[in-house]
Amino acid sequence: MVGFGAPRRTGRLPPFVLVALLAVIGLLAFNYWSVSARQAALHDELLGLQAQVQRTEVARSRLEKRNSELMMQSDSHRRQIEQKQGEYQGLGERLQARDIQAQRCELDKSKLQNNVSLQMADISHLKEQLAELRHEFLRQEDQLHEYKNNNTFLQKSLQEESQQCAQQLAERKREYEENLTKQKEELDKQPQKDEEEGGTVDNKMHILPSEVKEKIEDPSSNRLPFAQDGIKLESDAGMPEIEDNEPAKEDSLQNDVKGQDTGALPSQSKSLLEKQPSLQPLSFTEHEVKKPLPDKKETVQIPEVEENALQLEPHPLKQMPRDSKTMSFNLKQSRFFDENESPVDPQHGSKVADYNGDDGNVEDDDHDGQADAGEYHKDHLNETL
């Protein structure tokens, strides 16, 4: 094939015919393409319409079913309405019955209000009675406090009376000591009288040991004046038995003999006795007296007397039932109660202490402190003696 610029050969179609044919072919191709595209669109539309028809058929069947259901529901609603109307009539009848019952309740309410007013009056009366009972309770409580105060006052008065008794006993003991010193002075003056009389001295020296022995053996002569009635201080107070005052007299006789052994004059012995501290009564409380004393017995003998002192033969004395500490404590303990007064009942004291509560414990602590002080005074007094 030759190009357009080449010389044209003879026997062939001209080029413009070829161009026209090509244009026709293109036009036909374009028409075919547009027709095919329109056919496809129409086919699609047909398919869509068919689907829409199917959907409308389905919707129609659904609507028919829905219509049948609605008809059934309308029938059921109609029946329900008829039933509700019957229930409404029943509720109306019940409402009338409730109205009648409400009227009855109003009547009952009025009756209850009347009863409440009566009960309120009763409550006010009971409150008045309660106030009276409270006043009575307060009055009895005041009486109880007054009774407690009276108990404490009685306890204090008993303590004061016991102290007064102890002071009286101390005064009697002082009188006893004065009488004892007078007897010692008379005993010191007796040898001088015997020497003046002459031949009667030997007879009196033989009689004197027997008299001393009888005095030591006879417990009634060694007792205090207020203890000679045979009254035992042991009573329901729980106090230990107060021994006789024989050890005190033996101790004083022993001190006298010791003073004569050392060659002391009667005036010097009297001055020594005056220099000794006086036995002050200690305030023993019931708590201290209740403690039993240890029962100790020691053998104490009077030493032999020299020949130049009264010219007495050595004479052994009887055994002392207690030592010096126990003896001094027995003397103080014997001073605690008078022979005409009974000791304080320990049960009464314990009841008062239990009744007062913590006050009894505080008094026990005070009694313990007084007991320690009393023991210290006793030890110091025994050392000085």
Swiss-Prot record:
Residues 356-367 have a biased composition (Acidic residues). Residues 34-385 are lumenal. Residues 170-193, 211-220, 285-299, 368-385 have a biased composition (Basic and acidic residues). It is found in: Membrane. Belongs to the GOLM family. Residues 265-283 have a biased composition (Polar residues). The keyword Manganese does not apply. Residues 169-385 are annotated as: Disordered. Keywords: Coiled coil, Membrane, Signal-anchor, Transmembrane, Transmembrane helix. Residues 1-12 are cytoplasmic. Residues 44-193 form a coiled coil. This is Protein GOLM2. It comes from Xenopus laevis (African clawed frog). It is a single-pass type II membrane protein. The chain crosses the membrane at residues 13-33. GO terms for cellular component: membrane. PANTHER family: GOLGI PHOSPHOPROTEIN 2/GP73-RELATED (PTHR15896), PROTEIN GOLM2 (PTHR15896:SF7).
